[in-house]
A protein has these predicted regions:
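Conserved aromatic-histidine-acidic binding/catalytic patches
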Residues: 6-10, 53, 77
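Conserved nucleotide-sugar donor-binding catalytic segment
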Residues: 1-48
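Short, charged, amphipathic alpha-helical segments
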Residues: 77-83, 107
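Membrane-interface aromatic/basic loop that binds lipid-linked glycans or pyrophosphate carriers
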Residues: 97-153
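Catalytic core of nucleotide-sugar-dependent glycosyltransferases
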Residues: 31-39, 45-73, 95, 100-119
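Amphipathic alpha-helical repeat scaffolds of TPR domains
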Residues: 82-94
């Protein structure tokens, strides 16, 4: 398996595939991955072109997770890809609320998620946080209210 080249959030595409094909996993307290936020990193950039690419690439990742879900032979793998897709969709909604400049841009991302059956967020009981966020973001007007509250931070 390889990282998908030239996209942001390539780890969101790669990691689920890695887990699905691993055969076995070991739980350990060893730190094998460290994430460092840099001021100049892509995810911290306010550049409009980078933000546009970021959301385009997030949708690519959702599409690829859907493809992996359909192609998976084992039921557990199908469920894992499905769950990862739905939880990544939550991340896309949250990032849209935080980063996109206006209601129209947010509405466009929501429409694209809806076309993929990822918004409103599917009813699933992954965690109480997922359920709460799903209820708070199941309508565009609710998202617009939350966006205003986030801007006040």
């Amino acid at each position: 398996e390889r990282f998908l080249p030239d996209i942001y959030h390539e780890d969101e595409d790669f990691t689920p595939r890695l887990f699905a094909r691993s055969g076995s996993l070991i739980s350990t307290n060893l730190m094998v991955y460290a994430y460092y936020q840099r001021q100049e990193s892509i995810v911290n950039s306010g550049n409009a072109d980078r933000i546009k690419k970021r959301f385009s690439d997030m949708l690519v990742v959702i599409d690829r997770l859907e493809e992996q879900e359909r192609a998976a032979e084992e039921e557990l793998s199908r469920y894992a890809f499905h769950r990862r897709k739905e939880q990544f969709a939550l991340s896309v909604v949250y990032q849209a609320m935080r980063l996109l400049p206006g209601k129209e841009a947010v509405a466009d991302v929501l429409r694209q998620l809806a076309d993929r059956h990822c918004w409103p967020l599917p009813k699933a009981r992954y965690s109480w946080r997922y359920s709460l966020f799903r209820h708070l973001t199941d309508r565009e007007w609710k998202i617009n209210v939350l966006r205003q509250l986030l801007k006040r931070k």
